[in-house]
UniProtKB/Swiss-Prot annotation:
This is Glutathione hydrolase 5 proenzyme. Heterodimer composed of the light and heavy chains. The active site is located in the light chain. GO terms for cellular component: plasma membrane. It comes from Homo sapiens. Residues 30-586 are extracellular. Belongs to the gamma-glutamyltransferase family.
Length: 586
């Protein structure tokens, strides 16, 4: 009897032990297979604006490349898949988080003003906008030296390996992507493209190329092969640069090989702004990080949450405060002048990062949206948008890169170097931003506390100067929770509005990353009028109109955001469907 009882107890204990082991095993497995959802990755991810380029970036990571390696490879690819947005003839900004050192640095390789330029260039803004075609708007390209500096500091794989996938793409029968074809057939762009040297590349007779049409580009393939094997100096001081300078001189360009040789990227610390549990790292002036930081810092103080969006009046209230904050931000863009070229601007953006100004702005935001432009320090300025490309990368070790690259407006200056296969930027067009409509050029570069003196005046370009930019490749880090958000966007002047709204929706309003990027945005122009992306909530639009917000129609919206987030063991990556993007990870 006792023996039978003992056997029963032993069996019960054995069963309990097995059950406990199963539970422990399940817990352990759940940690490795966390409930991340089917769209999550376990290790790393790349978000470029096309599937093929995201895939190339992922492959580089899987070959033990660093996040910088993957970013460069994805950008080189994008210059071929979406050449209307970026390329070797443009410029790039990297924001890089090194998990080993815990530091975030910025490499600014945006284009600069060449030594020879028209002193009265900015008097041509009214005639040039919105496209800015012509060789007079070309800045010194910085793209390749930006890649080289980033690779020198943070690369792991051999330099040439980063170019091989795109060279293979070009040599293997490259075809036109649907997004590129859409730009080629755009009714505004098409006449200028047809009249430019780009016609030889993108037209079949009188017709623009269509999706899946062959796009032979042997000159660019050869250029990439040369840069891969010989390094970037073959462009900046060697035969590639000489060929480019000679080609575009036929279009009226005054760019010289000396301009190329003098170009150097700038390496600086990222701006750092606390946003509750997160810290935002973004690029300093002349990039737009200070404006993005200002917007989010002001909005943080309103303590918006998921509950704020639960009822119609709450949603209207959130977007009213956003609109008013964007108006005040627009009035501060004068602070984005290049501090290297204009020393009095050295500390001009510092106030934008602090709580004192943020609190002052919050106190000036009330329930109405019909204040005079002077309330926000707004002056009617030139604006344009739709260009640029962004890549976000998160590596296995937690290091991250946000990189935004551009030739400025679609197809840049529409000037093509046939021997190198390079499309040139029109970056000097961004200098028009500092010249309010109706202003003339003034020889005085700095007057008092504000650049250019009173509103209505502007000052000529300075050789070596970088244009003010809306580019905001950014990284947000929550060290306590081990969370990150690597984010940036494209779309010219729409970039800051789009990125700010994606961050606001993700951090505070309860949106997941995909929904935060997909949500229709609003934008405030320099007249203080609200522009709504198609499908933006009509209910919110009516509510804002009731509060006195003026609205206007924007002829063309193309705001594009790419982001990667890390939440515990889960990695999420989203490329914006507005540009038919698709992220990749593993």
């Amino acid at each position: 009897m006792a023996r039978g009882y003992g056997a029963t107890v032993s069996l019960v204990l054995l069963g309990l032990g097995l059950a406990l082991a199963v539970i422990v095993l399940a817990v352990v497995l759940s940690r490795h297979q966390a409930p991340c959802g089917p769209q999550a990755f376990a290790h790393a991810a790349v978000a470029a604006d096309s599937k093929v380029c995201s895939d190339i970036g992922r492959a580089i990571l899987q070959q033990q490349g660093s996040p910088v390696d993957a970013t460069i490879a994805a950008l080189v690819c994008t210059s071929v898949v979406n050449p209307q947005s970026m390329g070797l003839g443009g410029g790039v900004i990297f924001t890089i988080y090194n998990v080993t050192t815990g530091k975030v640095e910025v490499i600014n390789a945006r284009e600069t003003v060449p030594a020879s330029h028209a002193p009265s260039l900015l008097d041509q803004c009214a005639q040039a906008l919105p496209l800015g075609t012509g060789a007079q708007w070309i800045g010194v390209p910085g793209e390749l030296r930006g890649y080289a500096e980033a690779h020198r500091r943070h690369g792991r794989l051999p330099w040439a390996q980063l170019f091989q996938p795109t060279i293979a793409l070009l040599r293997g029968g490259h075809v036109v992507a649907p997004v590129l074809s859409r730009f080629l057939h755009n009714s505004i762009l098409r006449p200028s493209l047809q009249a430019s040297t780009l016609r030889q590349l993108f037209f079949n007779g009188t017709e623009p190329l269509r999706p899946q049409d062959p796009l032979p580009w042997p000159a660019l393939a050869t250029t990439l092969e040369t840069v891969a094997t010989e390094g970037v100096e073959v462009f900046y001081t060697g035969r590639l640069g000489q060929m480019l300078v000679e080609d575009i001189a036929k279009e009226g360009s005054q760019l010289t090989l000396q301009d190329l040789a003098k170009f150097q990227p700038e390496v600086v610390d990222a701006l750092e702004v606390p946003l509750g549990d997160y810290t935002l790292y973004s690029p300093p002036p002349p990039a737009g990080g200070a404006i993005l930081s200002f917007i989010l810092n002001v909005l943080r103080g309103f303590n918006f949450s998921t509950e704020s969006m639960a009822r119609p009046e709450g949603r209207v209230n959130v977007y009213h405060h956003l609109v008013e904050t964007l108006k005040f931000a627009k009035g501060q863009r004068w602070r984005l002048g290049d501090p290297r070229s204009h020393p009095k601007l050295q500390n001009a953006s510092r106030d934008l990062l602090g709580e004192t100004l943020a609190q002052l702005i919050r106190q000036q935001i009330d329930g109405r949206g019909d204040h005079q432009l002077s309330h926000y320090s707004l002056a009617e300025a030139w604006g344009h948008g739709t260009g640029t490309s962004h890549v976000s990368v998160l590596g296995e070790d937690g290091s991250a890169v946000a990189a935004t690259s551009t030739i400025n407006t679609p197809f840049g200056a529409m000037v093509y170097s046939p021997r190198t296969g390079i499309i040139l930027n029109n970056e000097l067009l961004d200098l028009c931003e500092r010249c309010p409509r109706g202003s003339g050029t003034t020889p005085s570069p700095v007057s008092g506390d504000r650049v250019g003196g009173a509103p209505g005046r502007c000052w000529p370009p300075v050789p070596g100067e970088r244009s003010p930019s809306s580019m905001v490749p950014s990284i947000l880090i929550n060290k306590a929770q081990g969370s990150k958000l690597v984010i940036g966007g494209a779309g010219g002047e729409l970039i800051i509005s789009a990125v700010a709204q994606a961050i606001m929706s993700k951090l505070w309003l309860g949106f997941d990353l995909r929904a935060a990027i997909a949500a229709p945005i609003l934008h405030v122009n320099s007249k203080g009028c609200v522009e709504y992306e198609p499908n933006f909530s009509q209910e919110v639009q009516r509510g804002l109109q009731d509060r006195g917000q003026n609205q206007t129609q924007r002829p063309f919206f193309l705001n594009v955001v790419q982001a990667v987030s890390q939440e515990g063991a889960c990695v999420y990556a989203v490329s914006d469907l507005r540009k038919s993007g698709e992220a990749a990870g593993y």
